[in-house]
Amino acid sequence: YSLDVNAAMQPGVMKGSENQNLGANFNMTYMKEKLTMRASVSLNESNSQNSPYGSFSQYTRLNPYYIPEDANGKQVKVLDNNTVSGQSTVITNPLYDATVGIKDGTNSLNVTTNLSLEYMILKNLRVTEQLSYTRGLAGSDRFLPADHSSFELEDDLTRKGSYTKSSGEMSSWSSN
């Protein structure tokens, strides 16, 4: 038999983002005369948090001359506001969004169980059976408060802010 445990804690590229992966594997083999039985169980969990500072692509669209802070050192919500032919274009500050308390993360959990039986009928003749069962759970959680810059052009106060929570599960059997 064997037992393996692994963990990987990785900071993301953007400030405040991270990925955490945990896993464990248990393997066992039993042999008696003409019968061999193998069993394994694998458990894997993954959690990630997206950066409250926005995505890298948001920063690539900003001009270097925008000033993200006011005279008091406080982050401003809007960096630039243009109206062309009646259409408003707002350039928002992703640094501001980090101060309003957003939540944006995902998680998953997977369990896989394998069972293999082998029986030697004759020296060159054997019967095998393999069973596998997998169960998985996944979810995400995203909260943007009403003061988040993505709602800057929204005038209706009842449409500002959002919360999205999703979850899913799967299971599968296979046999050979």
Say what each PLM segment does:
Residues 19-21:
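Short, solvent-exposed loop/turn segments in extracellular or other extracytoplasmic domains
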Residues 1-17:
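Short strand-turn segments of transmembrane beta-barrel domains in outer membranes
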Residues 1, 7, 28-32, 117-119:
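Residue-level signature of outer-membrane beta-barrel architecture
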Residues 12-14, 23-112, 128-130, 134-176:
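Surface-exposed loop/interface segments of Gram-negative outer-membrane beta-barrel transport/assembly proteins
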